[in-house]
Amino acid sequence: MKLHLTGLLLLTLCLSGPIITVDAQERATFLKGPKDATDQYSGLEYGPIDANDTLWRIAERYRQNNNLSVYQVMTAIYELNPNAFENGNLNLLVDGAVLKLPSERYIARIDKQKAQMRAEQDDRAFAEL
């Protein structure tokens, strides 16, 4: 009898209580990147730079989306780390520097042609040194 009353009480509570629905937006899960990540900075770093490193090789290894050019990645790395380059030239990495690596979103905003032109201009200036 006691079991029957408990079941009846539970059934009454379930039927008389308000029905609660949860909107899909309320249940959404938000993903965050690395602790230090921003829209510009991925939270990843490369370095310290040594004499064997080139920006081209670093950008080529770091690029994960083949829709982005190596030139775009190079330019984005430069923009986040201007003090890691001598005379503002993409070819003159400072030994010992640690580079902050850009987010894919930050890289994608850079114009492919302008990035390539910038790199070619720096190549010409570097050749004259």
Which positions does each model-derived feature cover?
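Cell-surface/extracellular proteins and modules involved
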Residues: 1-129
